[in-house]
Amino acid sequence: MTEIRVIILCKAPVPGAVKTRLIPAVGAGSAANIHARLATETIGDCLALARSHPEVQLELWCSPDTQHAFFHSFPTVSLFNQQGEDLGERMAHALCASSLPAILIGTDCPPVNKAYLQNAIEQLKHKPVVIAPAEDGGYGLIGMQVPSASVFQNIEWSTDKVLTETLSRCEEQELEAFLLPEIWDVDEAKDLDRWLAGDAKS
C-alpha cells in the first residue's frame, strides 16, 4: 500500500449544534468549545502523522460546509463538504470519493492519537477492513483497502448495534474486518471528566 487517505469528519463548532448531550452540564458555548478543542487535538495528531508518513493524504470533511473560520485555521489541510442525509451516507460519500485506501475518523475519540492511527495504517496493509470498536457499541475509526458504500447501508446509527451491524455488512461482502483496541468517545459529562483526567490511553 502506497498512498492512503486519512479522512476526518468534523462539524463546525457552533453553539447548540455540537456536543448537545453535554449542554445540560456545561452549556452550549462550553460544549462548542470542548468540541473545538477535541477537534483541534485530533487534527493536530493527524498533521503530525502526515509529517512523518509522506504517503498520508489528510482530508477534513466539514459540516455544514467549509466556510466556518475554525476549518480555515488548518491551512495545510484539504477541505471538503460532507454530503448525505445520515452518518452512513456522509461516511460512504467521503470514503468513496477516491479509490485509494482510506481511514476515516471523527473528532471526539481521545484514544485515536498518532500512535493509534499508525497502528491502524499498518493493520490495513494486511486486512481489507480495520475498525476501532467503541465502548458504546459503535466505532470511532474505520479503514478500507477498497472503499465500499455497502458497508454503511442498513445500519441503525446512534445505537449500540452499529458495530455488530457493520461487521455483518462486512461479512456479507466477504470482507475480513480486523478489530483494533477498544476506544471511547466524549459524549456525556462522565466522558468529559475522563478526558480531562487524562485518561485517553485507557
Label the model's feature ranges.
Residues 164-202:
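Conserved alpha/beta core of the MobA/IspD/sugar-nucleotide pyrophosphorylase nucleotidyltransferase superfamily
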Residues 148-169:
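Short, glycine-/small-residue-rich phosphate/pyrophosphate-handling segment
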Residues 33-53:
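A short, N-terminal amphipathic alpha-helix
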Residues 112-138:
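Conserved donor-nucleotide/metal-binding helix-loop-beta segment in metal-dependent transferases, i.e.
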Residues 69-101, 159-162, 190:
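Short phosphate-binding loop-to-helix
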